[in-house]
A protein has these predicted regions:
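Cyclic-nucleotide recognition modules
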Residues: 11, 57-116, 120
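Cyclic nucleotide-binding regulatory domains
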Residues: 6, 22-85
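Short proline/glycine- and basic residue-enriched helix-capping loop/turn segments at helix->loop/beta transitions
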Residues: 1-20
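Phosphate-/nucleic-acid-contacting segments
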Residues: 145-201
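A residue-level structural signature of the nucleotidyltransferase/glycosyltransferase Rossmann-like core
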Residues: 34, 56, 89-90, 158, ...
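Short alpha-helical segments that sit at the start of domains
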Residues: 124-148
Length: 201
């Protein structure tokens, strides 16, 4: 078990294991839960009124995720939080979380650090996804996953990103995703599995 100040806040009884590509919250869902990621990773994907999607948030082990922490409140956009790989989370009601956090200076400081990190990752993903080249979208998103979530247990590559999820994370058609990944594999940048991709560390 890794060391985190949130382990003493989120009840162990709330721990659940979620399969990959499982939604923690969906567009329009008025969830008041805050989730602590004990293991795994979650991506937040925004879809605008035209149906265009791209990643706006990425959280790994030790991070907090919640619908009320989403990066947008505008009515013409929606955010969905989805697990990238099998993920273990704990949860608690937002009001209980805020009460426990704000009365403890150490937790309040840790919470502000979390929010600052979320903003930094969101800004980086925005820059990556605004690239005019689709290949750069894919390269940038995979590199960000490796940077935020670190290596998988083998230490040689990042956690696996499902290919179907990568399409939504980048807003890139699957045929372009597939062609780009084949090129990246020949250059030794990624490893391709049956239905997932790993960034080579």
């Amino acid at each position: 078990m890794f060391d985190s100040p949130w382990l003493s806040v989120f009840p162990e009884a709330s721990r659940i294991t979620l399969p990959r590509e499982c939604d923690i919250y969906a567009p329009g869902e008025a969830s008041d839960l805050v989730f602590f990621i004990e293991r795994g990773a979650v991506v937040e994907i925004r879809t605008d009124h035209l149906g265009t999607s791209h990643a706006v948030g990425l959280s790994g082990r030790g991070s907090l995720v919640g619908a009320r922490l989403a990066a947008t409140n505008t009515s013409n956009m929606s955010v969905r939080a989805t697990t990238i790989t099998e993920t273990v989370v704990r949860s608690m009601h937002r009001s209980v979380f805020l009460h426990a956090t704000l009365r403890n200076p150490d937790l309040a400081s840790a919470y502000m650090t979390q929010l600052a990190r979320r903003l930094e990752v969101a800004r980086h993903l925005s820059e990556v996804c605004s690239s005019t080249r689709a290949g750069d979208h894919i390269l940038g998103v995979l590199h960000t996953v490796a940077d935020v979530c670190g290596a998988d247990v083998n230490g040689n590559a990042s956690i696996p990103v499902p290919s179907s999820l990568l399409e939504r994370m980048t807003g890139t058609p699957q045929r372009i995703v597939d062609a780009t990944l084949r090129e990246l594999r020949t250059r030794g940048i990624v490893e391709l599995e049956r239905d997932a991709i790993r960034w080579v560390m």
